[in-house]
């Protein structure tokens, strides 16, 4: 890692993680670790729920990262029906919880907080930072496309609301969004009531982010250049900070691989394997899991399927026995490392930003089935903007539809084009990390913004 000169400062950074979605807290911690290593005299107080912290801090961390467990905001005895309910309860309680915990951390550390480094969802951090006379730096856990959609919420609602718009109509009135359609935008941006908890929080975020000293995302400059330019016109400072894990390699001996995925992959030919995973929040419904299994079995494509144990009951009877030589189904897999394996041929994904970025960094094409939030925007980028993958017809898995997508990638000429385009994006990412690229300079700018007093 490039060494930066250590500033002589007495900084205390409060890091506020968004726990209900692991795709948010993990990348924020990764950046925090990198910042802590670059500025060892700065204290980073990392606030997150006990359960989330337990999974994130399973290994050692720098001494200047102080871990603080906070309440999840769910009243004792409350029965939750879906993940969104947990998100809403947490967002409602978060301002009170964080104010109290930050005050306690200041006493414990003996330093006033000088910077708030938070998930962008926490719009109220702008007010807390002002109260503390601290700077606010926000992390958006998605791509430039979804951030742009949120920052243009008012214009999108005004423009679409003025006419009987087709869901297929493109967003040509927003620079950089010309290839995206109305149907790709998250519902909370366009259609949902802004008085309900989650859409209201996201709308308040869109109004608050221009107050932040800096906003950064996990990405690299050449992935969405026009959108980057657009966002720099809306925000005080906008930075792409590509995670180091995308380029670093882990030896098989060092890797956590409890189910032997790497050993299995080592027996397969180059670019032949389909990897299937849909993140940590939601899986496709049972009938689609059946369709995936049927499509895999019929296609004969080798596969590694990361599927939660509770959902394995939905697999067709006898599927695991019949496909024992063809593939493996495991409750967890080392996704980042597997995607880099030479045998990997395609990533079958929900198109969450982290998954998309991991595929891009590995030069692996994608088959997408968007599920929620920014997934449709990312899927559109994969299929139409970057041309590195294909989406499921009508956004759902069917046996025939999945087989067609597998053939598109592994058999037809379209697959060769996807692979070539994916390779080009991988090379652009590698160049971005070189001395000629912007990643190191952007990280230095972020570091200076966060540790200044």
From Swiss-Prot:
GO terms for molecular function: quercetin 3-O-glucosyltransferase activity; UDP-glycosyltransferase activity. UDP-beta-L-rhamnose binds at residues 280, 333, 350, 354-355, 358. Its EC number is 2.4.1.-. Pathway: Flavonoid metabolism. Disulfide bonds: none annotated. It catalyses: kaempferol + UDP-beta-L-rhamnose = kaempferol 3-O-alpha-L-rhamnoside + UDP + H(+); UDP-beta-L-rhamnose + quercetin = quercitrin + UDP + H(+). An anthocyanidin binds at residues 24, 150, 373. InterPro entries: UDP_glucos_trans. One of its GO terms (biological process) is flavonol biosynthetic process. Expressed in leaves, flowers, siliques, and stems. Expressed in the shoot apex. The active site is at residues 24, 119. It is an enzyme of class 2 (transferase). Keywords: Glycosyltransferase, Transferase. The keyword Transferase applies. Disruption phenotype: No visible phenotype under normal growth conditions, but mutant plants exhibit altered flavonol glycoside patter. SUPFAM superfamilies: UDP-Glycosyltransferase/glycogen phosphorylase. Belongs to the UDP-glycosyltransferase family. Flavonol 3-O-rhamnosyltransferase that catalyzes the transfer of rhamnose from UDP-rhamnose to the 3-OH position of kaempferol and quercetin. Possesses low quercetin 3-O-glucosyltransferase activity in vitro. This is Flavonol-3-O-rhamnosyltransferase. It comes from Arabidopsis thaliana. The gene is UGT78D1.
């Amino acid at each position: 890692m490039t060494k930066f000169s250590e500033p002589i400062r007495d900084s205390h950074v409060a890091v506020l993680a968004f726990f209900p979605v692991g795709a948010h807290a993990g990348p924020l911690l990764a950046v925090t670790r990198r910042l802590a290593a670059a500025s060892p005299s700065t204290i980073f107080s990392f606030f997150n729920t006990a359960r989330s912290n337990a999974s994130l801090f399973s290994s050692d961390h720098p001494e200047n990262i102080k871990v603080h467990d906070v309440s999840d905001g769910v009243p004792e005895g409350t029965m939750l029906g879906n993940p969104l309910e947990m998100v809403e309860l947490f967002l409602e309680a978060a301002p009170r919880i964080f104010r109290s915990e930050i005050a306690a951390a200041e006493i414990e550390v003996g330093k006033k907080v000088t910077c708030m480094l938070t998930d962008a969802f926490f719009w109220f951090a702008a007010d807390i930072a002002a109260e503390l006379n601290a700077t606010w730096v926000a992390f958006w856990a998605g791509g430039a496309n979804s951030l742009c959609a949120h920052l243009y919420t008012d214009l999108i609602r005004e423009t679409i609301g003025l006419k009987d718009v087709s869901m297929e109509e493109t967003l040509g009135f927003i620079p950089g969004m010309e290839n995206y359609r109305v149907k790709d935008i998250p519902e909370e941006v366009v259609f949902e009531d802004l008085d309900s908890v989650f859409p209201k929080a996201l709308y308040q975020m869109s109004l608050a982010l221009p107050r932040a000293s800096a906003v950064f995302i996990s990405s690299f400059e050449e992935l969405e250049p026009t959108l980057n330019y657009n966002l720099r016109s809306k925000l005080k400072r906008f930075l792409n900070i590509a995670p180091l894990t995308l380029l670093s390699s882990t030896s098989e001996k060092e890797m956590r691989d409890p189910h032997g995925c790497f050993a299995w992959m080592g027996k397969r030919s180059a670019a032949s394997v389909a990897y299937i995973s849909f993140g940590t929040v939601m899986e496709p419904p049972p009938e689609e899991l059946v369709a995936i299994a049927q499509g895999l079995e019929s296609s004969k494509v080798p596969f590694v399927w990361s599927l939660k144990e509770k959902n394995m009951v939905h697999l067709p009877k006898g599927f695991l026995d019949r496909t024992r030589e063809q593939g493996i189904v495991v409750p967890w897999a080392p996704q980042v490392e597997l995607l880099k394996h030479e045998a990997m041929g395609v990533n079958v994904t929900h198109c969450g930003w982290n998954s998309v970025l991991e595929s891009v960094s590995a030069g692996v094409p994608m088959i997408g089935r968007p599920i929620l939030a920014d997934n449709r925007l990312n899927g559109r980028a994969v299929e139409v903007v970057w041309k590195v993958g294909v989406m499921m017809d009508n956004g759902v898995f069917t046996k025939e539809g999945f087989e067609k997508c597998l053939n598109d990638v592994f058999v037809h000429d379209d697959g060769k084009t996807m692979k070539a385009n994916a390779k080009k994006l991988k090379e652009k990412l590698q160049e971005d990390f070189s001395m000629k690229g912007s990643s190191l300079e952007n990280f230095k700018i972020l570091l200076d913004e966060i540790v200044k007093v």
